[in-house]
Amino acid sequence: MIKPGLLLLIFFAPLVSAQDWMATSFEHTEVSPGIYMLSGAEGKMSGGNITLITGTEYVVLIDDGFTPLGPALLQKIEALAGRPADFVINTHAHGDHTGTNQYLDEHGALIFAHDKLRARMESDPEQNTGPGALPIITFSEEMTFHFNGHEAYVFHVPSAHTDGDAAILFRDANVITTGDLLFRGLFPFIDLDSGGSVSGYKAGMQRLIDMSNDATRFIPGHGPVSTRSDLRQDLEMLVDAEARVKTLVDKGLSEEEIVSANPLADYHDDYNWGFITTERMTRSLFRSLTTE
């Protein structure tokens, strides 16, 4: 089985060399005072979006990007916060969100994550890049951090993108970091081989919507800073896409027949992208409907 992080590299490698698509530096968006979204500069890839929280007490990072970007990430953290990260919270185990765990551990960070995330990283050489890559503090359902005047509520979202997903609500700032529960304006990657499910993904998105309001700002796993309306739009797309594929499954069509029918054709222009194409989304929904 090819792992998600490797799939990303396989997709881009034949097109251009790594120096052409992988970021060498980070840009930032201040979502709320002291809360930043970091992403690859000049539109290049750094992995998933990263949340950085600065302040006088602690420097906290949520997710941390591809492994080669450790030095560039540390430079960006120090530029905004004045020192390295004290804590890292991982939202799930994929290497585009955990790749610099080891590097940040070597620079003093303590890593937190869900129990199942650690278990997956322990068993996967691609994600377990060294002894410091593994979270040393794990939780089963929820935990709350109190730092820099923030109350950060970290909670498990079961069987969604993976089986070890977490999202983080900053109650005071009205900001939510979603991890890969949100691929804004893109077909989502639902990792059925790592405990994810379409039903759990939909439930997770709905939970985020229910705990937010129109002023909430979301830092997605991939894509720009988003709103509650954006989440609703992407959830409506997923619900409708699943229903379209289910109609054909119920008629007895095979996977290849459904792919040929192209039931998601009118979503292609808005949601198709290199990693999750319209065809791959269709196949994922078929597999989910016939195995869950």
Roles of regions detected by a PLM:
Residues G55-V60, P68-F112:
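Active-site metal-binding motif and surrounding structural segment of the metallo-beta-lactamase
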